[in-house]
Amino acid sequence: MPAIVIVGAQWGDEGKGKATDLLGGRVDYVVKPNGGNNAGHTVVVGGEKFELKLLPAGILSPNATSVIGNGVVINPQALFEEIDGLEARGADTSHLRISANAHLVAPYHQTLDQVSERFLGKRAIGTTGRGIGPTYMDKVGRLGIRVQDVLDESILRQKIEGALRQKNELLVKLYNRRAFEVDEIVEYFMGFADRLAPMIVDSTRLLNEALDRDEVVLMEGGQATYLDVDHGTYPFVTSSNPTAGGASVGSGVGPTRITRVIGIQKAYTTRVGAGPFPTELFDEMGERLRTTGGEFGVNTGRPRRTGWYDAVMARQAARINGFTDLFITKLDVLTGLSEIPVCVAYEVDGQRFDEMPMTQSDFHHAVPVYENFPGWTEDITGARSLEDLPKNAQDYVHALEAMSGCRISAVGVGPDRDDTIVVRDLIAD
């Protein structure tokens, strides 16, 4: 059976959790391959809203094993707060497994994240301050602490001693902050060791053996394509690769075992934090999309920036990830609009760009070229086929499919798991 990847095709918050949850009852493993608790997603089950950060959306599917992959950076305190919160509401998290090779976020990573953002001033990236970037820096710099290290306190201590020699120099001499003690960091991590130990696995072997048994593995990328450290709007990006290729690296599942790559896009566009956003709306319409769509960050509560659908970005995302399918979410948010603009090209200094400009400077100065589509007023939350939609809504969906260059296989028409039009099976087809 296949390995399937779900990827955000914009700047995050597209509804990946809903897509994962929709498929979760039919898959055997749900994997989070990258990111940390800097990106949250919301899943609505039976009218009840669950806000997840570190845990894969599949944690709410009792028949699927949830796996936090090697590409994730884990704040253990945040992890167990999330687990305890779900269990207090009756959820079963006993099917969670964690890669031994995933890295751990230390208290000094969070401090460094926060003080470095303040140090950058106007050049700040707009991080969540949760230590994700500094943890990835230590991973690449070979100063990182991995999940498996809590199984051996002596190794953990050696690694922390090495890391703090550098971190304390930065904190004290550059940022005028206090130094961290080795003992306090060792005690912090060892305080989670007993709860972590039963969950720790060789996730590469676990997932590949599942595929050998013809079981279905679903990988849910965090963040999104345009937050990818290589392919995103650099430097306003995350510190990992939340594209389809990153799912392979962050899970240990080889690329030839991946048969479906599903891109998730809103029927409009949102972004959190700093960075270019050609179709951004600063007027009452932007506020309408924000309010109607509930566009506030799961982690921070920050209001999201809102704008129209960008077909140029959609085509580029399809290329980068090799999308086989698109899942359009929140079509219902557009209900009631008399006209819906879609960005079909850019103009930069009088020159038209039908595809993404090569440089970030040009993208930063891009002015959208719009094509307008007629809206609809009918309630679409009960639609379960494209034919159930008003004609103008059908035309809008077909236009997005044509402009993105990728088939649309599902459309979200409301907040609940069941508020979805499935055009074609996302597993069997």
Curated annotation (Swiss-Prot):
Cofactor binding summary note: Binds 1 Mg(2+) ion per subunit.
GO molecular function, a single term: GTP binding
Keyword Chloroplast on entry: no
E.C. number(s) listed in UniProt: 6.3.4.4
Active site, UniProt feature: 13 (proton acceptor), 41 (proton donor)
One Pfam family hit: Adenylsucc_synt
Residue numbers binding substrate: 298-304
Primary site of residence: cytoplasm
Highest taxon in the source lineage: Bacteria
Keywords, in A-Z order: Cytoplasm, GTP-binding, Ligase, Magnesium, Metal-binding, Nucleotide-binding, Purine biosynthesis
Binding-site residues for GTP, renumbered to this chain: 12-18, 40-42, 304, 330-332, 412-414
GO biological process, one term: IMP metabolic process
Coiled coil regions in record: none
Group of enzyme by EC: ligase
Cofactor(s) the protein requires to work: Mg(2+)
Cellular location(s): Cytoplasm
Catalytic activity line of the entry: IMP + L-aspartate + GTP = N(6)-(1,2-dicarboxyethyl)-AMP + GDP + phosphate + 2 H(+)
Described function: Plays an important role in the de novo pathway of purine nucleotide biosynthesis. Catalyzes the first committed step in the biosynthesis of AMP from IMP.
HAMAP family: Adenylosucc_synth
Family, per entry: Belongs to the adenylosuccinate synthetase family.
NCBIfam families: PRK01117.1 (NF002223), purA (TIGR00184)
Protein's name according to its UniProt entry: Adenylosuccinate synthetase
Organism: Kocuria rhizophila (strain ATCC 9341 / DSM 348 / NBRC 103217 / DC2201)
Taxon lineage: Bacteria, Bacillati, Actinomycetota, Actinomycetes, Micrococcales
